[in-house]
Amino acid sequence: MPAALPDHFFHRDAQLLARDLLGKVIRHKVGELWLAARIIETEAYYCAEKGSHASLGYTEKRKALFLDGGHIYMYYARGGDSLNFSAEGPGNAVLIKSAFPWTDATSDENALAQMQLNNPDASGAIRPPQRLCAGQTLLCKALGLKVPEWDARRFDPQRLLVEDIGQAPERIIQTTRLGIPAGRDEHLMYRFVDAGYARFCTRNPLRRGQVEGRDYLFLDQGN
């Protein structure tokens, strides 16, 4: 049985949580299989800034954002499911932006094959592993995570958990979040990417034309 992170792990500042989640593995049990993906990209959100759902105010749909750290907040984005975890402070949370399939003794090649069946490409063909979880809705589809089943719930160590498998990134890239409309605090550098997996995330912050110090920063572990 995988070892779940305790709820208090999530009860910390959203940016710290976003950084500390990089390298952790999400596991979701479907049937007899533990589907798994290593987190490689996260975004932090605060109630006090305009890019967050919580800034629009409390509703029953958004209640998970206002609960203690470690509650699951899911919503639909562009027709797909998205996964967030509440952080310390009402309305603060971390969006799991992308991940990379993870295989080990608990989550084997059969689990990976099931993830590929869950998330074929537009033509129905099998996606290569490196593209399987390269976006917030792709991740949820591959792992079989659905809004009606998990929104506003706690983790269930028997079915859904986040595990520390000792794979902390050597360097972290800090940059701006994706998809934030103009005038909604789009300038805030609240997106964090495992530098070793940058080419597999939603949008590579190291792509041509991006300038260090202007468009992104490197954070060494311990900073």
Swiss-Prot record:
GO molecular function, one term: alkylbase DNA N-glycosylase activity
GO biological process: base-excision repair
Species of the source: Pseudomonas savastanoi pv. phaseolicola (strain 1448A / Race 6) (Pseudomonas syringae pv. phaseolicola (strain 1448A / Race 6))
Keyword DNA repair appears in the UniProt entry: yes
Family: Belongs to the DNA glycosylase MPG family.
Family annotation (PANTHER family): DNA-3-METHYLADENINE GLYCOSYLASE (PTHR10429:SF0)
HAMAP family registered for this protein in UniProt: 3MGH
EC number(s) stated in the UniProt entry for this protein: 3.2.2.-
Official protein name in the record: Putative 3-methyladenine DNA glycosylase
InterPro entries: Formyl_transferase-like_C_sf, MPG, MPG_sf
Keywords, comma-separated and alphabetical: DNA damage, DNA repair, Hydrolase
